[in-house]
Amino acid sequence: MILLQSHSRFLLQTLLNRVHNIEKGVELDHHWVEFDDVRYHIQVSMKNPHIFLLSVSLPTPSSETIFVCGLPFGAIEAIKAAYGSHVQILDPPRDGFNLTLKINLSKIPANQDQRHAFLVKVASVREVVLGAPLRVILKHLASRTVAPDMDRLVALVHRPKESFFLLPQVDKVTVVYPMRFNDSIDIVLATSFLQEFVEARRTAGLNNTPPCSWSHTPPVELKGVSTDALSANAGFVSFVIFPRHVEGPKLDRTVWSLSTFHAYVSYHVKMEEVMLKEGMILWKGIGSFS
């Protein structure tokens, strides 16, 4: 399984460039979107060249999702744990954003390796924030417990007004994704890809990876979920996560893989579309010589 990078490459490069040229005092004001769902805004003024403001707008949550003060539950604690005193959370955030972080670049670690690691973590703010509730649940799984008030089906946002679902238990966490796509070609390609994905994992005998299944209809874990949340046109994918999948350093990898699963599938669908188009162009080219 190809893993998408957990950090924003553009944000990391911008941070590195800023740190290396901090005395030049160049003003910055950039907006961009990644994964088609997370919007970023960075600001640096000439008046305060050491202060880097990073604002993040998250996907609009569905009605089933738990947001606290505009953020997924556990996000504030996750931000403080990840960045410590080097980052200040502005309250309220900039208009139109869920979160604004104030970073004093003159106070970040002086050691080159530590500084780079810190900037990579800042550039991974999407993972830190959106992955926070998933991390809380999976950390409890690692200790074979269930997080307080989480002994029921939990909805987590991963796309605008779309959720994936977790059913936490002491010995496992079942994760279910209703897969939706807008384009009719994407639906066909995604359905085919997901069936092949599940079958390949089964036949390869990947005993160390989470068990995975796909179905046209909602699995029993989603009983009682609203009809809107179950409107999946590419089926449902389920993973069963056991404590061994979240032990030690495996936790970060599992959190990121689950947080970006839909983006991972979308990436492969788009790649297949490109290959199909290139194949059609090649076929037409060959036909022109007949």
At which residue positions do the language-model features occur?
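Short Lys/Arg-enriched alpha/beta "domain-start" segment
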Residues: 1-73, 98-150
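Residue-level detector of beta-strand structural context in well-folded domains
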Residues: 24, 31, 88, 153-155, ...
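Amphipathic N-proximal alpha-helical interface segments
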Residues: 44-47, 91, 165-172
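Short, internal acidic amphipathic alpha-helical interface segments
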Residues: 61-96, 102, 132-160, 170-240
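Ampiphathic alpha-helical segments that act as solvent-exposed interaction surfaces
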Residues: 66-90, 104-130, 196, 200-201, ...
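Low-complexity, intrinsically disordered regions in eukaryotic regulatory proteins
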Residues: 235-251
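Short, highly charged C-terminal tails/helix-capping segments
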Residues: 273-290
